[in-house]
Amino acid sequence: MKVRILTVGNKMPKWVQTGFDEYHKRIQPMLTTEVVEIAAAKRAKNPSDANLAQYREQEGQAILAAHAVAGREQLWVLDVKGKMLSTENLADKLSDGMQQGDDIALVIGGADGVSPEVLAKADVKWSLSALTLPHPLVRVVLMEQLYRAMSINHNHPYHRGN
């Protein structure tokens, strides 16, 4: 099983890269992961609602193109309106995917959200939190949760939950 993280934006602060790299390194023996950075649409200084829709559309087309390159993989989209999963639920979903041989493309949208086209094609809409999180932080939280879920599946002592 492989998880590709399709993420809009590519200039992350050093602290984000450091945190992400730490969990990326730890997870490698348990799960193959790859990051595909998608350029954010160029934004106007004071964008209108129409501009925001155009940005989402442009980024959405790039996300779907990156997803199409891999062939068959489940499309999971991070969305505030998605279903919340406990870490244990995530571990179960990843375990099921591994048994079925499914690869996953996990989408972190742009600053203005994800296009309706991407949401319509999503196999899973997942909310990390009811809170609005900054996109750089989402990268770190996502990788840590993937690592935590895989540590559960591999009986690693990292997770000390129920």
UniProtKB/Swiss-Prot annotation:
A GO CC term assigned to this protein in UniProt: cytoplasm
CDD domains linked to this entry: RlmH-like
UniProt EC number: 2.1.1.177
GO molecular function per UniProt: rRNA (pseudouridine-N3-)-methyltransferase activity
Catalytic reactions of this protein: pseudouridine(1915) in 23S rRNA + S-adenosyl-L-methionine = N(3)-methylpseudouridine(1915) in 23S rRNA + S-adenosyl-L-homocysteine + H(+)
Major localisation: cytoplasm
Residue ranges that the Swiss-Prot or TrEMBL entry lists as coiled coil: none
Domain of life: Bacteria
Top-tier EC class: transferase
Chain sites annotated for binding S-adenosyl-L-methionine: L78, G109, L128, S129, A130, L131, T132, L133
Key words, A-Z: Cytoplasm, Methyltransferase, rRNA processing, S-adenosyl-L-methionine, Transferase
Annotated compartments: Cytoplasm
InterPro entries: Alpha/beta_knot_MTases, RlmH-like, tRNA_m1G_MTases_N
Functional description taken from the UniProt entry: Specifically methylates the pseudouridine at position 1915 (m3Psi1915) in 23S rRNA.
Family: Belongs to the RNA methyltransferase RlmH family.
HAMAP family assigned: 23SrRNA_methyltr_H
Subunit relationships: Homodimer.
PANTHER family listed in its UniProt record: METHYLTRANSFERASE, RIBOSOMAL RNA LARGE SUBUNIT METHYLTRANSFERASE H
Stated name of the protein: Ribosomal RNA large subunit methyltransferase H
Organism the protein comes from: Psychrobacter cryohalolentis (strain ATCC BAA-1226 / DSM 17306 / VKM B-2378 / K5)
